[in-house]
Amino acid sequence: VAGTRGLMGRSRMGIVVRKGAPLPDISSTEAFRQAMLDAEAIVCNVASSGVYMVKLLEKLGIGETTKDKVLKLPDTVKVMEHVAGSPAHAIGVGQLAEISELADKGLAIALVAPLPDAIQNVTAYNAAVITASREQEAARALARFLAAPEAKAVFAATGID
């Protein structure tokens, strides 16, 4: 329905290491590239974050060099659990919202930082009322609720801006 589409929030990708491990410098694209070369393992999921990461490594010219240390796991929980339990200098990749949630639950991971803006992958969450909806008023109410400052505060607390 025209005029009902709205941005609810954006999720960005971040890098984690095991809690207590040295934090690599990923403050720029070149620093990020070097951190990936220095890592003993790069752990990502098989979903969109992992697909993006593999393509990013290729784009940075280090896909071939790093391919043997890229470990793809089924989901972000498995990625973060692996990094938390890894004695090696492993770097994990995931959505900031998921990283925040798992760290809050006590998983022994430390957020290094979001990916640098120049190489960041942003997932946008939108809401809209579809024309085929039989409950358009309820859908409009939900979209208004999700766009309200109170909902935005909840999103922000979970890493979605």
Regions found by a protein language model. Give the residues of each.
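Exported/periplasmic ABC-transporter solute-binding proteins
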Residues: 1-161
